Design a protein with these regions (language model features):
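Conserved core architecture of multi-subunit DNA-directed RNA polymerases
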Residues: 1-210
């Protein structure tokens, strides 16, 4: 969950683009790091401070044209190409992630609003990250896509891995199921309850309670 939190602090929650770009010298130095693990941590250090996904046209924003010595053409300015959305501060509380926004009020000071980041929301953000951004972050798009860190399909171990246990130790008396089997049964029952709630058109908060 800590890795997912860091990735959510690197990318935009709306368009899934990395919040920094090559106009930032620190970001350029970070993505040129050879070791993928160190590259990820350096990119995270640069991006976690940013609170907005840039969408301004830097070429038109600069009124004064910049020229390189000895060149007649102005230097090309690469735009970030983001969506302009304000980014929340991601907070971890136990096994939950929350997004903290600063809401500007018409009268009075700013107030902070906290919204839970559900697994569905996080999975959608991580799934949209481009392969180029994954490489810049130090992740392998073939073996370490970030959305794979969130379980959508639960692997069930076969019965030999979770054998039933004899209560009296003789092997002939009453037997009890392994703890893992009980937990898998709880998960299946919860999934069935969610499916039934969705089929019956129940409100979203009821399905979320399961």
């Amino acid at each position: 969950i800590k890795k997912v939190k860091k990735i959510l602090e690197i990318v935009c929650h709306n368009c899934s683009k990395v919040l920094a770009d090559t106009s930032d010298p620190e970001f350029v130095a970070a993505i040129n790091t050879r070791d993928p693990k160190s590259r990820f941590n350096r990119v995270w250090t640069v991006c976690k401070k940013k609170r907005r996904c840039e969408n301004e046209d830097r070429q038109n924003k600069d009124k004064e044209e910049e020229f390189a010595p000895g060149l007649k053409q102005p230097l090309a300015v690469e735009n970030h190409g983001g969506c302009g959305n304000v980014q929340p501060a991601v907070r971890q509380a136990a096994l939950q992630l929350k997004a903290a926004f600063e809401v500007v009020q018409e009268e009075g000071p700013k107030r902070k609003e906290t919204v839970p980041i559900t697994p569905e929301m996080a999975h959608g953000i991580l799934r949209r990250i481009s392969e180029e951004d994954l490489r810049n972050m130090g992740l392998n798009s073939d073996y370490a896509r970030p959305e794979w860190m969130i379980l959508t399909v639960l692997p069930v171990p076969p019965p030999p891995v979770r054998p039933s246990i004899s209560m009296d130790g003789t092997g002939t008396g009453m037997r009890n199921e392994d703890d893992l089997t009980y937990k898998l049964g709880d998960i299946i029952r919860a999934n069935n309850n969610v499916t039934q709630a969705i089929r019956e058109g129940s409100p979203q908060h009821i399905a979320r309670d399961f």
